[in-house]
Amino acid sequence: MADEKLLKMEEARKVSVENFGKIIRFYAPSFTYYKTSFYSSTPSAFPTISVTGSYCALKCEHCNGIVLNTMLPALTPAELFRLCEKLKMEGAVGCLISGGCMPDGSVPLGRFAEAIGLVKRELGLTVFVHTGI
């Protein structure tokens, strides 16, 4: 069993290197300051954006919606693109786009799909999305 898992991991690494090379990049959301001997975050390098502002229907115990208050709000697709343009000009390399959850646990990102594509294609930002729980 362990040998089988090791073989799968080795194969996955081989495929990864063939497609992406040996460099591994790590991104840390900017809402928390990180400083280690290997990495120090900056507030504008990889900001977090909420498409719901401070709204969250679930208010889960782990966050209670408080994390949303650390995020930049972008409530419309146009606001999202303009915010990302500004962030790019300020030196951002990417962003995390998320927001509060709806009652079913999803983050309402559907109407932002086209704007997210434009952010990637036109601005060249690395974009991560958190789609819900």
Predicted regions and their residues:
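Flexible, acidic/Gly-rich N-terminal and inter-domain linker regions that tether
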Residues: M1-S54, L58
